[in-house]
Curated annotation (Swiss-Prot):
Keywords on record: Amino-acid biosynthesis, Cytoplasm, Hydrolase, Magnesium, Metal-binding, Methionine biosynthesis, Nucleus
Family to which this protein belongs: Belongs to the HAD-like hydrolase superfamily. MasA/MtnC family.
Name of the protein this chain belongs to: Enolase-phosphatase E1
Organism: Caenorhabditis briggsae
Main location: cytoplasm
Higher taxonomy: Eukaryota, Metazoa, Ecdysozoa, Nematoda, Chromadorea
Length: 249
């Protein structure tokens, strides 16, 4: 069902991909850019402290993943071998659409360079910014929750096709708070922002995320956008649907 009644909420929590940004932008532009440029980025920035921290995190992650994934390789110590191993693992995880925090951190650094050099601009649907401005004018805080790193989220909104949108966003959450399919993640977000679960509206295109948020006590709406996965009728009935952000006003 499409929402036909006014929704009352005191905080807005937004998914990114498939909700306010097209899936094709992430799938067909951002991910392929990181896939193609991971080795090149490591070659150019290998000795930087931020890169070394992520490499160590990726080394520990590889050790864990090796237990359940035979395609993951152990990351060796020597520079060229290390770059080769990290590149192989990251490309493997991108292909598998893994939501792994250290991998997302490296993607964020790669995308930062792409944004800074003007190679990419963050896609945002045309209905998003006008509605967010109205919501902000009502002194309702707006938060982002995505599996992409907070760093990558900020980059997208600072370098969007609509300009710098970060001034109207109050905060960002990623997998450090918990996975998006886990009810506890939404409880933690409620605690951190100081707004009761029942007063938070969460918008997403993913049924499992809507289910987890709803179980935590949040209000939810499933967002239907071009290219999104087809929703079950059961989920539509349970959570309601919208096609643009105008429908939450």
């Amino acid at each position: 069902m499409t929402n036909t009644t006014t929704i009352q909420f005191n905080a807005l929590l937004l998914d990114i991909e498939g909700t306010i940004t097209s899936i094709s932008f992430v799938k067909d532009e951002l991910f392929p850019y990181a896939f193609e440029n991971v080795g090149k980025y490591l070659e150019e920035h290998y000795d930087k402290p931020a890169t070394q921290i992520i490499i160590e995190d990726l080394r520990r992650l590889a050790e864990q993943q090796l237990e359940t994934d035979a395609d993951v390789v152990k990351i060796r110590e020597r520079k060229q071998e290390c770059i080769e191993d990290v590149t192989k693992n990251v490309r493997h995880w991108i292909k598998r659409d893994k939501k792994l925090t250290p991998m997302k951190a490296l993607q964020g650094l790669i995308w930062e360079e792409a944004y800074q050099r003007g190679y990419v601009k963050g896609h945002v649907y045309p209905d998003v910014l006008p509605i967010l401005k109205i919501i902000e004018s009502r002194q309702i805080p707006i938060y982002i929750y995505s599996s992409g790193s907070v760093h990558a989220q900020k980059l997208l909104f600072a370098n969007s096709v609509e300009g710098d949108m970060t001034k109207i966003l109050y905060g960002y959450f990623d997998t450090n708070i918990g996975l998006k399919g886990e009810t506890s993640s939404y409880t933690k977000i409620s605690e951190q922002i100081g707004v009761p679960e029942k007063d938070i509206l969460f918008l997403t295109d993913v049924e499992a995320e809507a289910a987890a948020a709803s179980k935590a006590g949040l209000q939810t709406r499933l967002v239907i956008r071009p290219g999104n996965a087809t929703l079950t009728q059961e989920a539509k009935n349970a959570y309601g649907t919208i096609h643009t952000l105008e429908e939450i006003l």
